[in-house]
Each structure stands twice: as structure tokens, then as C-alpha cells.
Amino acid sequence: MLPSLQSLTKKVLAGQCVSVDHYHILKCCGLWWHNGPIMLHIRRNRIFIRSTCFSQGIELNIGLMKAVKENNHDLIKLFTEWGADINYGMICALTENTRDLCKELGAKEYLEREYILKIFFDTTRDKTSNNIIFCHEVFSNNPNLRIIDNLDLRGEIMWELRGLMEITFMLDHDDSFSTVLTKYWYAIAVDYDLKDAIRYFYQKYPRLHRWRLMCALFYNNVFDLHELYEIERVRMDIDEMMHIACVQDYSYSAIYYCFIMGANINQAMLVSIQNYNLGNLFFCIDLGANAFEEGKALAEQKGNYLIANALSLKHYNPVISLLSVVTDPEKINRMLKNYHSINMGIFLDYEQR
């Protein structure tokens, strides 16, 4: 829809750096939301708005969705005139009056399945705490999503989290669709270390504490891992934890943490071979793993002759500097952030001869 002169003026005003002394002007102009000013800025050719309810900033379409969810008709009109796609609002429109307004502003009566999936994944694109919490609030238990087959969206989520799903078996068809979505948002929060979002899910869903622990292991988030295991006392079998840590390659911090906590490093070595993870394999050797014959047999069985050849060498030794007990995540991160395996270097030198 074509913007009015009034909405264009408001758009220019929202893009200015306005001092606190002049906030009353913004309030008089309707640029006020949740007891704070609405600010606007452009990032990578996309319009973002910021207010007290979204201190980190959100994309304009997502701001529209929140305004629709709150039945805030003035902001629905304003954001639409600023360029928001009113069809995004239809996802959140739960009252007849608001749905009618969205249609008046150009929304389709019926959104195709593919378009709803597009809206879903476009909305999750910005990995901030504000946005992930909002996605959870908008999409979980949303009757408008019944338009699509939940199996479609479930399948997309399962694909995005496929590595995690293969080892945890916690996101299966016995879960309600709402639970699947919650686990999805929670996993994103842990993967991107979104502390406010992590805190939100942790307090709201005590039954998913183990899920958070699994995500911390899988995504190599040693800070979250330490907080859960040592401070919050969330527990799993330590070898099971190590198994999850070894599934993604170069997960040095999570592997080291589990090793220090008593996990079997030879079992970790075998899991790394099972998953074709050369980086993890040599890191386990650096930590003292020595299941060479068993590992070689496993590699040959899986047809991975590069790893089998690597395990045939007799020149590997534990790295003494790694064997000191360090549990502070800051120190672990500093120690391993740019770590290069000494034993992998030995193997690569041998290969180049």
C-alpha cells in the first residue's frame, strides 16, 4: 500500500537520534510502544525497529507480527505503510477485528502452505534472544498454523537439527508439535549462546533441562555446559555426554570438559571414528586415547582407510599441557580456541613424505 505523508514523516522521525528530553514528541506522534520510543534503522537493506520490548532490534515484519498479536491497530497500519508484509500479520491474527483489518490492508484470505513455511523460516533468521523468544510465543500453540500439515514443518525442523536428533532421540513423533517447536527454539538459543533466551526457556521449561545439556554438548558451548553441569547440577551419564560431544567434529571444548569430568577417552576416540571426525580423533589422542587396534579395525570396517592408516603409525603421544585439570570455561575456551593437534601434525607430516 502507498504510505501517507504522515507515516513517511513518522518514519523519518523514528530514524533520528532523539534525546530523552524530546521523547514526548515521539509519544504524541504514536511512536511509542511498551512505555518506550520506537526507533528505526536500516541494516543490510532491511528495516529494523527497536523499542523497550525489543531492545536488540527486530525486523519490521516481526514488529508487525507482534503488533497484530497485541491487536494494536495503530501500529499495524503504521508498520504496513512503512513496508511490512501484512500477510505476516495474518499468522498472528486471532481476533475477528484484527483479521478484518489485515484483509483491509491487503492480506490474503488464505495463505498457501509454502508461504507459511517461508514466513516461519524468515522469522527465525535473526538469531537474537528477543527474536527467538518472540518466535516461540507466536508460533507455539498457534491455531493459524493448522492451515499447514504439522508434519511438513516438523520434517523441516528435524532436517535442520538432524545431527542432534540422530543421537538424542528426544525430538520424535511422540512429541506434540508445540514441544517440537519449543525444543527447536531452545536449540537455537544454545547454539548461538543467546543468554536471555536460554534463561527464558530454562525457567519456563524445567522438564527440558537435559535437552539444554544435550544441546550444549552438541554445539560445543562450554560456557552453557559448565553452568548446567557444575552450577545447576543437571546430570547425565558422563560417557553419554562424551558421546554427544564427539558427534560434531572439532568439538574440542566439550570433549575436554567431559574428559576432565571423568569420561572414557578411548570410547570418545571410537565414537569419533564412527562419525568420521578426524579432528576429534586426534584431539582424543592428544588427551591420551590409545585404542589404536580397536580403532583401526573399526575404521577398516567402515571403509575409512585414511583413519585406518593414521592409526597404524606408532609415533603419537599425549600432549602434557592438556592433561592439567581446568574446569573454568573461560580458561578452556582460551586454551582451545585456536588449538591445532600436535598428533595430527605428526600424521600430516608423515603423509607428505
UniProtKB/Swiss-Prot annotation:
GO biological process annotations for this chain's record?
Answer: symbiont-mediated suppression of host cytoplasmic pattern recognition receptor signaling pathway via inhibition of IRF7 activity; symbiont-mediated suppression of host cytoplasmic pattern recognition receptor signaling pathway via inhibition of TBK1 activity; symbiont-mediated suppression of host toll-like receptor signaling pathway; taxis
Asked whether the keyword Nucleotide-binding is assigned, the reply is: no
- What stretch or stretches form a coiled coil here? none
Q: Keywords of this protein's UniProt record, alphabetized?
A: Host-virus interaction, Inhibition of host innate immune response by virus, Inhibition of host IRF7 by virus, Inhibition of host RLR pathway by virus, Inhibition of host TBK1 by virus, Inhibition of host TLR pathway by virus, Viral immunoevasion
Instruction: Spell out the subunit comment.
Output: Interacts with host TBK1 ad IRF7.
The job of this chain, per UniProt, is described as: Plays a role in virus cell tropism, and may be required for efficient virus replication in macrophages. In addition, inhibits the phosphorylation of host TBK1 and IRF7 and thereby negatively regulates the host cGAS signaling pathway and antagonizes IFN-mediated antiviral activity.
**Protein name stated in the entry:** Protein MGF 360-11L
High-level lineage: Viruses, Varidnaviria, Bamfordvirae, Nucleocytoviricota, Pokkesviricetes
